[in-house]
Amino acid sequence: FYDLNELSEYINLSAFDDDSLSYGTINGKLNALPTGTNCITFYYNKTMYDRYGLSLPENWSDLINAAEVMKSDEVYPVEMTKKAAYLSSVAYVEQVTGRKMLSDSGEFQYTSEDVRLMLAFYQEMLNKKVTKPAWDFDRNDLEKCLTAGVASWISDAEYYCEPAQKFGFDIVIGDYPKHTQAVSSGWYKKPTSVYAIKKNTKSPEEAAKLLDYLVNGEEMALLQGMGKGVPASKAALEALEARDMLDGIEYKANEKMANSEELEIMSPKLENQGVLDLFISTSE
């Protein structure tokens, strides 16, 4: 891909913070710009937690304790999408051992014991009714009060939470769960999507101007809103803010992520579909 640093005359790179620029930087070259940032986030129906006399969960033990209270009504404290279940298990192993699944170079470095710990953690979540199996995840369960929470990407927040909000439930953003004696956070963030320019383009200036319009342009920002996530570009954010278009559960989740210092940059290899499928099939 084209090094976008070489096209900074046409692209306002100053609209992006260092983390946003790092997503598309490889070996010092800026290959892509993000539209927004994403991470697994826990959304809770505070109305239901209040009814059960429970505080919102801060750690895995809180979720287990909530399950003890809710299971007599066949209610789960939280439901997880497949990706959320997988990344929660990855987070748990890192929190307990301090070891990451991937090295800085992207090499798999879990031991066999780490893999067993990862699978055992998720099995415990299932056995103790903290969450229903990810392969049975139902987006309608939150509004039906069959679950008191959902864990998913920020970009999917409105899809899962808005129906419950329309029923009058107070849906709030929860903490990123941890082990009570965690030695590491274990949670990651990534770009929602990215734009890049082919290295062999015959029209780099025109392509750069188009890219700038897509990520920084006021007109594009207003047309797109938060369709590709809360904008990573400060220019696009300002355009939305000026028109009171920054609101809702997705924006609140994005604000929590932006203000968190515990989230690391996710390697694309952490989302390897083969590893995810193996995790799910083994858990089944």
Listing of model-derived features with the role each one plays in the protein:
Residues Y23-T35, I40, I64-F108, Q123, ...:
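Extracytoplasmic/periplasmic solute-binding protein
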Residues I40-Y44, Y195-I197:
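Short glycine- and hydrophobic/aromatic-rich loop-to-beta-strand nucleating segment
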Residues T47-P57, K128, N200-A207:
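Short helix-loop capping/hinge motifs at secondary-structure junctions, enriched
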Residues E158-F167, T180-S281:
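C-terminal lobe and pocket-closing loops
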Residues K29-L30, K71-P77, K128-V130, C145-G149, ...:
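Loop/turn elements at helix/coil->beta-strand transitions in domains of secreted/extracellular proteins
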Residues F1-I40, S55, I64, E94, ...:
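Hinge/lid segment of periplasmic solute-binding proteins
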Residues M48-Y49, N65-V69, D138-V150, I154:
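Short helices/loops that flank or line small-molecule/ion binding pockets
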Residues V69, E107-W135:
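Glycine-centered hinge/linker elements that transmit conformational signals in sensory
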